[in-house]
Amino acid sequence: MLKLRHIAAVLVYNLIAVHLPNSHQRFNFGGGRLRALCAREMLACCGQDINIERNARFGRNVELGDHSGIGVNASIADGTRIGRDVMMGPDCVILNRNHRIDDVTIPMRLQGYSDIQPVTIENDVWIGGRVTIFPV
């Protein structure tokens, strides 16, 4: 039954909710509420009073704390943990791996990628618009 709820939430989110207007717009047709409802079934862990904005994309193993939001057009990789009271501007990207840069004698494009690593954003953080976050 839980798997069916998850599948239904993914379908509703990707086919309808993601396209509804931003939550702060005057006539948003309940887009923010519908996206939050779907996110509760889709995220690994989901706090209270969350906000998911239009066209936000996130992996399955993402955690979102109380009173936090995912901004417009955000892209959040699997394994990301977002704490409480986090504000995120538009067009943010959180990645879970990077290019290897170990050997300066070899071009980066030939060194491949680092291993996948989780990213943790602590409590009470403001992530400005168009920020890209890489794992350490």
Task: Describe the role of every protein-language-model region.
Residues 1-42, 100-104, 117, 124:
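Terminal amphipathic alpha-helical/low-complexity segments used for targeting or macromolecular assembly
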Residues 20-21, 47, 65, 83:
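Glycine-centered flexibility motif
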Residues 29, 35-36, 57-64, 69-136:
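Flexible, glycine/small-residue-enriched loop-and-beta-strand segment within the central core
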